[in-house]
């Protein structure tokens, strides 16, 4: 039962990431490389955060909040460093594909001026590796005899990590989904600031919004151990909607188009549009493959007449 629970948690946690990967990344080799490179940059930021935490723990008695802040700043700086690297490598990427011409490398799309798509790809790479590191220790415990909680931590710690009870796997799964999508929005906002810096006075606003929302979401997550799971997820989901709407505006959309898109998605989900579309396509495919009986009868009658 423990292994089945772990597999179900992994599938649910990374299903949105898999959907985005298959829709926007899987068909392009360059985007696949950038996806994994984004994961690498997040791992580098985690390394520097670990070194900072190790150094601070030898000086200060309680370094939780300070180490958490340093970790967030390191992650945002890694996004800036990734943007600068891609900006310098843009000439090399443009040599692979020329705009309006046949690609030198088949299957590689034109990445020129595809800033927001690059941000989505790289942010998804950061989000996936972040969610994996966030969940894999807990999911490894779930794969055991089915005991939910951290027994060793319960013996030495003061916080009741077992307060969520049977809903603890669900909490980790929802947190992983939100964390992945948050990293996509934060990357879009930070890269928009990096692109517009020095061009407009308000270029710092998207980057500041990313840092503030990152801090807020992270500190809200620390309240999960105190039993405020429903409240934390509700606030985080609201913040995610605001971040997605802001990214939609950054990419040239409007709030009304964002609201209409959500309404249409809900309508399609309720009416099972995808299922109905698949059924209709299968019916059409079956009708095209089937051979009608009347022409065969007519041919048979014609042949009998000729023989007579």
Swiss-Prot record:
GO terms for biological process: cell fate commitment; cell fate commitment involved in pattern specification; embryo development ending in birth or egg hatching; embryonic morphogenesis; nematode pharynx development; Notch receptor processing; Notch signaling pathway; oocyte development. Pfam families: Aph-1 (PF06105). Residues 286-308 are annotated as: Disordered. Belongs to the APH-1 family. It is found in: Membrane. The chain crosses the membrane at residues 5-25, 32-52, 53-73, 122-142, 170-190, 200-220, 230-250. Essential subunit of the gamma-secretase complex, an endoprotease complex that catalyzes the intramembrane cleavage of integral proteins such as Notch receptors (lin-12 or glp-1). It may represent a stabilizing cofactor for the presenilin homodimer that promotes the formation of a stable complex. Required for the localization of aph-2. The keyword Isomerase does not apply. It is a multi-pass membrane protein. It comes from the Eukaryota. Component of the gamma-secretase complex, a complex probably composed of the presenilin homodimer (sel-12, hop-1 or spe-4), nicastrin (aph-2), aph-1 and pen-2. Keywords: Membrane, Notch signaling pathway, Transmembrane, Transmembrane helix. This is Gamma-secretase subunit aph-1. GO terms for molecular function: protein-macromolecule adaptor activity. Its main location: membrane. One of its GO terms (cellular component) is gamma-secretase complex.
């Amino acid at each position: 039962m423990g292994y089945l629970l772990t597999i179900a948690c992994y599938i649910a946690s990374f299903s949105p990431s898999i959907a985005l990967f298959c829709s926007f990344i899987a068909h392009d080799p360059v985007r696949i490389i950038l996806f994994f490179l984004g994961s690498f940059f997040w791992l580098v930021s985690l390394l520097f955060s670990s070194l900072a935490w190790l150094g601070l723990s030898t000086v200060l008695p309680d370094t939780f909040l300070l180490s958490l802040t340093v970790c967030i700043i390191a992650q945002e700086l890694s996004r800036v460093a990734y943007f600068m690297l891609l900006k310098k490598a843009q000439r090399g990427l443009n040599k692979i594909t020329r705009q309006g011409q046949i690609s030198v490398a088949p299957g590689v799309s034109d990445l020129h001026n595809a800033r927001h798509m690059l941000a989505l790809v790289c942010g998804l790479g950061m989000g996936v590796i972040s969610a994996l590191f966030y969940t894999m220790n807990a999911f490894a415990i779930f794969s055991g005899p089915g005991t939910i909680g951290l027994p060793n931590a319960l013996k030495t710690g003061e916080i009741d990590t077992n307060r969520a009870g049977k809903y603890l796997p669900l909490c980790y799964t929802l947190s992983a989904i939100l964390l992945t999508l948050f990293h996509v929005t934060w990357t879009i906002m930070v890269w928009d600031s990096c692109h517009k810096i020095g061009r407009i006075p308000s270029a710092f606003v998207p980057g500041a919004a990313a840092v503030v929302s990152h801090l807020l979401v992270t500190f809200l997550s620390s309240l999960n151990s105190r039993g405020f799971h429903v409240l934390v997820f509700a606030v985080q989901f609201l913040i995610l909607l605001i971040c997605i709407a802001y990214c939609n505006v950054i990419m040239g959309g409007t709030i009304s188009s964002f609201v209409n898109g959500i309404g249409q998605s809900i309508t399609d989900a309720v009416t099972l549009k995808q299922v109905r579309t698949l059924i209709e396509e299968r019916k059409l495919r079956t009708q095209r493959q089937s051979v009608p009986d009347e022409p065969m009868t007519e041919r048979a009658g014609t042949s009998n007449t000729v023989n007579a």
